[in-house]
Design a protein with these regions (language model features):
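Short linear regulatory motifs enriched in tryptophan with gly/pro/ser
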Residues: 1-132
């Protein structure tokens, strides 16, 4: 994948989040997830929230919509995925029938679930009960 990395890009395996300067309001950066599907994320630090107990970090406080399923074909593939979900008579419905998860809800997002993953992945930091 080395040849796919754009000029001026930094390999995420070589940088730590704290090195990105995310403590500054207005900080922007791009993140390319999944070279095959080319999910390009533009991230903007809109605000900083104070946290009384630093042990509650990292913490997800809000988000919009569910992440697209893995290997969904990038933006174009995900658009087809959504169209097929909405219209069972869609021309691509038969091709996608075995791939679609009937329980997937593109409108859902569970910050509590994300925080449980953070707890598991980042050492089980203590959280306030209302955010756990």
């Amino acid at each position: 994948f080395e040849e796919d990395i754009e000029a001026g890009a930094t390999d995420s395996r070589q940088v730590e989040i704290r090195d990105l300067g995310l403590n500054r309001k207005g900080k922007e950066f791009s993140y390319l997830y999944d070279f095959g599907d080319s999910w390009q994320h533009e991230i903007l630090v809109e605000d900083r929230l104070s946290v009384e107990n630093k042990g509650q970090l990292p913490l997800c406080v809000a988000c919009e919509r569910a992440c697209p399923p893995e290997d969904s074909g990038g933006v174009h593939g995900y658009e087809i995925h959504l169209a097929v979900r909405e219209d069972p008579d869609h021309p691509m419905a038969e091709d996608w029938a075995g791939w679609l998860d009937p329980d997937f809800d593109p409108e859902s997002f569970d910050a509590h679930r994300v925080n449980r993953v953070f707890d598991r992945e980042f050492g089980g930091f203590r959280r306030s009960p209302e955010l756990a």
